[in-house]
Amino acid sequence: MELASAHLHKGQVPWVGLLLTASLLTYWSPATTAQVTVEAVPPNVTADNNVLLLVHNLPQTLRVFYWYKGNSGAGHNEIGRFVTSINRSKMGLAHSGRETIYSNGSLFFQSVTKNDEGVYTLYMLDQNFEITPISVRFHVHPSLLPSLSPPTTGQVTVEAVPPNVAEGENVLLLVHNLPRTLRAIYWYRGTTAGERNEIARFITASNKIILGPAHSDREIIYNNGSLFFQGVTKNDEGAYALDMLFQNFDHTLMPVQFNVHAKKQ
């Protein structure tokens, strides 16, 4: 028995063809990089403080990403790159020893100077070897405090970057304006300073890090007071406390928290 058929008039398209075309478009359309954004945290910073060029929604299918000083991807402007297949970063000619590249694409500057001010560009190389650049800028202004006047504890702030994060991503508990006259800094899980809750401490006189019972091997403490979490889980969600020990042995606790949500499939 022959199958019935209908003759198409000019301008008509078979519905099967439409479905097939739509299916192919849906299947073959690659994920765009339009959702990728980069922000400077903070965008305006005082000299000798820290800046994070925070990347949101970095594609997980990249071969490698690069950070450059300025708008050009010239070799002498390369700060560093991160190769995803081996989970390793490599520093470039423009690296000053104060920059750190994270696996989530973000670039951290420690103790910025006026010379660091300007434009930086993230170059993303995908599986098809296509390059997508995204630029960001931050400004550096001189400190308004006299050079002999140490920062007060009232100026110290701690923020979670980002405050809401998907499982498996990274978080930085970023400390602004940490006093330089501290004896030590401590990080605790929760809002109280207890031995069992200690993640790590940094002894300023000896430039030494001591890990605590609550350290999970995924946290890194920096000498600027910041605490970095790699590959967070739902169990990491909650409050943390920065404890500053001053020269007169006074303590000041500063709480901060972040939320962890399930990764979108």
Curated annotation (Swiss-Prot):
Disulfide pattern: none
Tissue occurrence: Abundant in seminal vesicle and traces in epididymis and prostate (at protein level). Highly expressed in seminal vesicle, minor in colon and placenta and, to a lesser extent, in small intestine, caecum, stomach, salivary gland and bone marrow.
Region forming the signal peptide: 1-33
Entry-listed glycosylation sites: N44, N87, N224
Gene3D superfamilies per the UniProt record, alphabetical: Immunoglobulins (2.60.40.10)
Keyword Cytoplasm assigned: no
Compartments, record wording: Secreted, Extracellular space
Keywords, comma-separated and alphabetical: Glycoprotein, Immunoglobulin domain, Repeat, Secreted, Signal
Alphabetized Pfam families for the sequence: V-set
Main localization category: secreted
Function text: May interact with other CEACAM proteins on the sperm surface.
Family to which the UniProt record says this protein belongs: Belongs to the immunoglobulin superfamily. CEA family.
Protein name: Cell adhesion molecule CEACAM10
Source lineage: Eukaryota, Metazoa, Chordata, Craniata, Vertebrata
This protein's encoding gene: Ceacam10
